[in-house]
C-alpha cells in the first residue's frame, strides 16, 4: 500500500483538518491555518488564526469556526482564505473560552438560523456551558456549569488519598453533538455521559464508566451509536438508551486519540503514531507506517502521526480537459494523516477494495 502524495508547509506539528469552501484546511500547534490546493499540492492561502495550538475546527453556516489554546473561539468569514493573501484576515466573531485543558468545543446548527456551541465551562473544567448563537452573532447562555449528577457515582469507585470530596468525573476531555437536543461528554475519569437539552433545561440521561480509570480521548458518531476511545487500547460502542456498552474492542495500541468511520472501514490513530484500518467486523486490515525518507538528526521533530481526516472530493463544476486531468489526483476519498514534524501524508481510499486503501 503506497501513499498518494505529501503536503509540506507546516512549521509546527499538525493538529487537525476540516473541509471549508470545497477545500482542505489544516491547522497546527502554532495557530496557523493552511488552505490547500489539492490539484497542485500547494498552499492556496495561509494565516494565523490563534496564538497557540488550534484545538477545534469546524465549518459552519456563519463561516469557519476555530478554537485555540489562546482561550478564544473565532469565526472566519467566507472568503477569508482569499483575503489572507494581503495579511491575516479578521474574524467576524470572537468569544473567550476556558482552554485550561485540551478539550474541543462542539458546534451544531439549531432552529431558526441559530446555532449551539458547547464549551468547557468558564468556572470549572469538569463542567460544560452551552451557548446559543444568533445570526447577528449575539450570544445567550443556554446551559451553565453543567456537571454529571453526583449521586451517579458508584460506591465501588475509589478516590485518591487527599483528593477533594465530590470532585466528580475530572476535567472534560471531549464534547460531541448527536443532535441539537443531545450532547455526549467524555471525562478524565473514563466516564461517558449523555445529556438532553430542552427549553426546560439540561438533564443527564445516563453515565457509563466502562473506560475508567482511563480518560476518554475520542468520540465519533454513526447514526444512534457513539464510539469512544480511551487512553487504554479499548474502543467502546454505546447505543442509547442503553447505559451499558453494546460492544468492546481491543484495538491493540494504547491511546485511541482519533477515530473515523466509513461505510466499509474503521480508521484509528494511536499515541504511538500508528494508524490502523479495521473491517466492519473488526478485523485489522492494515497498519500505516511512515517510511524514513532521509537520515535524521536526533534532535529532529518527532515523526509520529497526530491526527487523521477522511476527505471526500466535492462535486466538480464544468472543467476543461486539462483541469480535469489535474484534479483527478484529488478525486475520491483521501485519508490525510498529520505528523508532528509538520508533514501531511495522503492515501487514496479504494471504496471497492477489501483492504480499504488503494494499492499501487
From Swiss-Prot:
Cross-referenced InterPro entries: WD40/YVTN_repeat-like_dom_sf, WD40_repeat_dom_sf
Domain of life: Eukaryota
GO biological process: chromatin organization
Entry keyword Nucleus: yes
Subcellular location: Nucleus
Cellular component, GO annotation: nucleus
Intervals holding WD repeats: 9-46, 49-86, 167-205, 317-357
Main location: nucleus
SUPFAM superfamilies: WD40 repeat-like (SSF50978)
Gene3D superfamilies documented for this protein: YVTN repeat-like/Quinoprotein amine dehydrogenase
Quaternary structure annotation from Swiss-Prot or TrEMBL: Component of the ASTRA chromatin remodeling machinery complex.
Protein function: Component of the ASTRA complex involved in chromatin remodeling.
Family the UniProt entry places it in: Belongs to the WD repeat ASA1 family.
Protein name from the UniProt record: ASTRA-associated protein 1
